[in-house]
Swiss-Prot record:
HEAT repeats: 118-155, 252-289, 292-328, 357-394, 418-458
Gene: MROH9
Pfam families linked to this entry: HEAT_Maestro
Spans through the membrane: none
Matching SUPFAM superfamilies: ARM repeat
UniProt keyword ATP-binding, yes or no: no
Keywords for this protein: Repeat
PANTHER family: MAESTRO HEAT-LIKE REPEAT FAMILY MEMBER 9 (PTHR23120:SF5), MAESTRO-RELATED HEAT DOMAIN-CONTAINING (PTHR23120)
Keyword Repeat found: yes
Name the UniProt record assigns to this protein: Maestro heat-like repeat-containing protein family member 9
Length: 573
């Protein structure tokens, strides 16, 4: 009986060994190809770096070469697999050296670019973006290279007399998201990179304020080694990240940081979107006052909500936080959209007016917008200013519609009482303006009237509105009733009910009559209203502020205006 020699390999084993050898040979060839490719790319990048070409074209061409090199790097086998290739110690050592040389070439390319121009730190941001788009690209060895380049930059900026690194905010946003990654090795490298970045930003700040830039002058001490310095405050702690980033970055860079995170809310990766939301909200809670370009951010949120509202609550919370620190900018932007407002815009209005602390500022901004006249051209507005970027000014219409949302809120009760005279008078102006433009505005002409009714009802004057409704006043006002008769009727009805806001309203009307409104029709409305309410017993209401000689002269001016309003007795009849 024949026996098989144990040393004899079967055909299957021979085939397996052959496949393994070819596979290893393929890996070796891939390393050699990466090595030769990176050497070639390095020479091209350095040649472009030394040429006198347009900086933007130079950067774009270099970025394409960097991306090509990046592609070679990420498909390389891991170091452990490289070690498996060798059959002897010398061969393994050669493969390891080749592996490390490839990484060193890529690192040298980046450091040579950054050493000449800190603007090219933007390349690191692009690398992080590439990794965020494909999880297979997110490798510890790439993060180590990024950290080494940032560490090299730290040593350079300590000797600079000026630091211009405009991409720090965008780079910080990408790194901050990786500080909450599931892989501890990625978290370690990202948090370390964040410390390097913030050190660069602190140097930039200190140079700008003529402070010394040695390591002792910063709370973020320059690390002595990667092993010793583990900034645990950044690891899985989004609140700390937001605090330190907000404290360190200059306003323009912090704005870039916020805008970048805002864009991440639309990421198809739920983890990225969730982490971005947390860091974004923390940042605005701590440092919203440093954010610039608020109008642009509000507009970006509106467009994102229109396209995709998966993170709607977070975006609306951003509106709320920005309104707390920049109410005027937020409200002006929210009023500069088509009228009538869509559901998305109304939700943003509600978010903007959710805090009682900013209610007075919101109403003051709306009153400022309501100084404009719908359809008024640029050259007809006082001092040549406009309230809208459009050919015509329709922001007052949006403001009237917004008041219908703001005024009934309980958080606005105190502010509405404070600004009742201004709101009442301004809305009467707007009702008149809209009645003039009714053929053009159509249904939109009723927003001012609706806002006026809401103001009456939320100011304890429901009976006034009921009386006006019984008299069919609102319907007539929107049809063919002479508006000056309407002003007289509103004033008379308010006077009959002895509305509690009478002293403040009379004082404000008198102030307007003395100072003179911007338009002649405003003057007519003010004086008709003022004359009507002045028939109330002023002594009983302690309206000692009514200086009759001046008022008489204003009333004479009213009679002389050629506005076809008839005699005042006709108006009162």
């Amino acid at each position: 009986m024949l026996t098989r020699n144990p040393k004899t390999k079967s055909s299957l084993q021979i085939l397996q060994d052959s496949v393994k050898w070819h596979h290893m040979a393929h890996k070796v060839n891939s390393l050699l190809d990466a090595y030769s490719g990176l050497l070639s790319n390095e020479s091209m990048i350095l040649a472009v770096n030394s040429s006198f070409v347009d900086p933007l074209l130079q950067f774009e061409s270099q970025l394409k070469i960097i991306e090509s090199s990046f592609g070679m790097l990420v498909v390389m086998p891991s170091l452990d697999k490289v070690k498996e290739m060798g059959s002897s110690y010398e061969y393994i050592e050669d493969m390891e050296n080749l592996y490390h040389n490839i990484l060193n070439i890529y690192e040298n390319i980046l450091t040579s670019l950054v050493s000449k121009d800190l603007y090219k730190l933007q390349i690191l941001k692009e690398m992080l973006v590439w990794m965020s788009k494909d999880s297979s690209y997110l490798q510890e060895r790439i993060m180590v290279i990024i950290n080494k380049v940032l560490r090299f930059t730290v040593t350079k900026v300590r000797k600079y007399i000026s630091v211009d690194a405009p991409c720090l905010g965008l780079l910080a946003a990408e790194l901050s998201l990786l500080c909450s990654h599931e892989d501890p090795s990625i978290v370690k490298q990202a948090s370390l990179g964040m410390c390097h970045l913030l050190y660069i930003a602190r140097c930039q700040n200190d140079i700008g304020t003529n402070k010394p830039t040695n390591g002792k002058s910063h709370s973020l001490q320059f690390p002595s080694s990667d092993v010793e310095f583990l900034p645990k405050e950044f690891q899985q702690d989004e609140s700390k990240i937001a605090q330190r980033v907000g404290q360190t970055l200059l306003p323009p860079l912090l704005t870039d940081f916020v805008q970048s995170l805002l864009m991440k809310l639309s990421s198809p990766d739920d983890k990225i979107a969730s982490d971005a939301a947390s860091i974004l909200i923390f940042t605005l809670e701590f440092h919203a006052e440093k954010v610039t370009m608020v109008s642009k951010i509000v507009d970006a949120i509106y467009r994102q909500l229109c396209d995709n509202n998966c993170m709607k609550d977070v975006m609306l919370q951003v509106i709320t936080l920005l309104t707390c620190t920049s109410p005027k900018k937020v409200i002006f932007q929210l009023m500069d959209y088509p009228v009538p407002a869509d559901d998305t815009l109304i939700q943003m209005w509600k978010a903007a007016c959710s805090q009682a602390s900013v209610a007075p500022h919101v109403l003051k901004t709306i009153l400022l917008i309501l100084k404009g006249k719908p359809g008024e051209m640029e050259d007809t507005v006082t001092e040549g200013k406009r309230f809208s970027l459009d050919i015509t000014n329709l922001m007052p219409l949006a403001a009237c519609q917004a008041l219908c949302t703001f005024l009934p809120l309980g958080s606005y009760r105190k502010a509405v009482a404070q600004y009742f005279p201004q709101l009442l008078t301004t809305l009467m102006f707007q009702v008149f303006y809209n009645s003039e433009l009714k053929p053009i505005l159509k249904d939109r002409a009723l927003y001012a009237q609706d806002a006026l009714r809401v103001l009456l009802n939320c100011s304890g004057l429901q009976q006034v509105d009921i009386t006006l409704m019984k008299e069919n006043f609102w319907d007539q006002l929107s049809e063919d009733l002479c508006y000056y008769h309407g002003v007289c009727f509103i004033a008379k009805t308010l006077s009959e009910y002895n509305f509690p806001q009478f002293p403040e309203t009379l004082s404000y009307l008198y102030k307007l009559s003395v100072e003179g409104p911007r338009r002649s029709e405003d003057t007519v409305i003010v004086l008709i209203f003022l004359t009507e309410v002045s028939f109330v017993d002023c002594e009983q209401l302690c309206s000692h502020f009514l200086f009759l000689p001046k008022f008489k002269s204003k009333f004479q001016f009213l009679v002389s205006l050629p506005l076809n309003v008839g005699s005042y007795q006709d108006l009162r009849s």
